[in-house]
Design a protein with these regions (language model features):
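Metal-associated gating/positioning segment near the N- to mid-region
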Residues: 72-142
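Sec-dependent signal peptide recognition
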Residues: 2-9
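Active-site neighborhoods of metal-dependent hydrolases
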Residues: 148-151, 156-183, 189-210, 221, ...
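C-terminal motif of bacterial Sec signal peptides marking the signal peptidase cleavage site
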Residues: 15-17
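Divalent metal-coordination and catalytic microenvironments
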Residues: 33, 53, 74, 85, ...
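Short, acidic/polar
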Residues: 90-98, 185-195, 249
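Histidine-rich, glycine-flanked metal-binding segment
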Residues: 22-28, 35, 39-80
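Alpha-helix-loop-beta-strand connector modules within alpha/beta enzyme cores
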Residues: 218, 222-237
Length: 391
């Protein structure tokens, strides 16, 4: 079998990296691999010696032996990959092996973009329990730290870390109401962030196109990120807009970083909708200008012209105020459906209108909770509309 580019992964602590021609014995030697060390430097062809869980040496090990040897000729050797936007929060509960990521070389899952697995109050636990689909589990934790302890104690192959979700903090105190927190509520929200940081959270994560996250004003986010910054926490964000108001959304993130002093990272940076593609150059300039001023601003992105989200992102925020049950109740009203249709067909709406950015021909349906609808998986929204005789 011809192997063009197979990756061999390691996540070990580097304690030596020099050539050694003396005779030594190791637990493991990986020979002749093309080493990508994660620094961005050009790869080097070399050997790697491992003792226990540590890299003992990188270099010429032709005179050394090991209990086990791997010939990595023609293969690449790299540190374990980091999934910076992991939604394995629930799958890891029922199967800690994480095989879908482990087999791709991922060794660290970072969660908490907007929503996190804690802190939870009793009503949040009931709501989460009622909304479980194929993955069923008991919620045996309350705080984010307790969730992380739970999956580690249960057994998990990957390393895990999490931001505390700004949405989770908001729902904990305000539910799904579209309003600003009172001063007392905001103080409790800040304290929840501090508690999460003491439990090991990386910082605060937001996902501002989704309800109820988009009910939060900038000042609310500044307050939460400031609390995280007391513990050297970071801020990550799915921006408030990735389309018509992309530049304004980037400036909001820069403002939050500037006021709080927290490093900030834009998650899956993009310009959604062809009419907005030209904005990326200006966004790059905004980021570089902020960095030149001393702010620690970064971004990550994926290299394809698509996105994945829920159909809730195609409907205006007002329709979802109050949570899932209130949203469904509104959809049962013909008056509301007519109003929704009118707003969804407005390409210049104030909210992040993914329906118009992609169009019904560009929206691919990939999952349903209702078994009767699973037959539509893999079809576009336009195809399903034609099959059902609806619009």
């Amino acid at each position: 079998m011809k192997i063009k580019h197979i990756f061999l992964f390691f996540l070990l602590t580097l304690i030596g990296a020099c050539s050694d021609n003396s005779k030594k014995d190791y637990d493991l030697i990986i020979r002749n691999g093309l080493i990508y060390d994660g620094s961005g430097n050009a790869p080097i062809s070399s050997d790697i010696a491992i003792n226990g869980s540590f890299i003992a040496l990188i270099g010429d090990l032709s005179n050394s032996t090991a209990k086990k040897e791997v010939n990595a000729e023609g293969m690449a050797v790299a540190p374990g990959f980091i999934n910076v936007l992991s939604w394995a929060t629930q799958p890891l509960i029922i199967d800690g092996r994480a095989m879908s990521d482990i087999k791709q070389g991922v060794t660290l899952e970072i969660m908490g973009e907007g929503r996190s697995m804690g802190p939870l109050n009793e009503s949040m636990k009931i709501r989460e329990k009622n909304r479980q689909s194929n993955i069923k589990y008991d919620i045996e934790w309350t705080t984010l730290g307790e969730y992380l302890d739970f999956i580690v104690e249960q057994g998990v192959s990957v390393n895990v870390a999490s931001y505390v979700g700004a949405t989770t903090i908001r729902v904990h105190e305000l539910g799904y109401e579209d309003r600003a927190p009172t001063s007392d509520e905001l103080e409790r929200m800040k304290q929840l962030v501090r508690n999460a940081m003491r439990e090991g959270a990386l910082g605060v994560g937001s996902s501002l196109i989704y309800t109820p996250a988009n009910f939060a004003e900038t000042d609310e986010l500044i307050a939460l990120v400031s609390a995280a910054a007391e513990y050297n926490g970071r801020y990550i964000s799915h921006l408030r807009s990735e389309a018509n108001k992309l530049e304004e959304a980037v400036l909001e993130l820069i403002k939050i970083s500037s006021i709080t002093g927290a490093p900030a990272e834009i998650y899956h940076l993009k310009a959604a909708g062809k009419k907005n593609w030209y904005k990326l150059e200006n966004v790059f300039n905004l980021i570089e200008t902020a960095k030149a001023s001393g702010l620690r601003i970064s971004a990550n992105m994926y290299t394809y012209a698509a996105a994945a989200t829920g159909l809730d992102a195609t409907m205006p925020p007002w329709s979802q105020e109050g949570g899932h049950d209130e949203w469904v109740k509104r959809l049962k009203s013909k008056k509301n459906r007519d109003l929704l249709s009118e707003e969804m067909l407005n390409a210049d709406s104030d909210w992040e209108n993914f329906f118009m950015q992609a169009g019904p021909e560009g929206i691919l349906l990939t999952g349903f909770k209702n078994p009767d609808l699973k037959k539509y998986i893999g079809k576009t929204l336009s195809e399903v509309s034609n099959l059902r005789g609806t619009s």
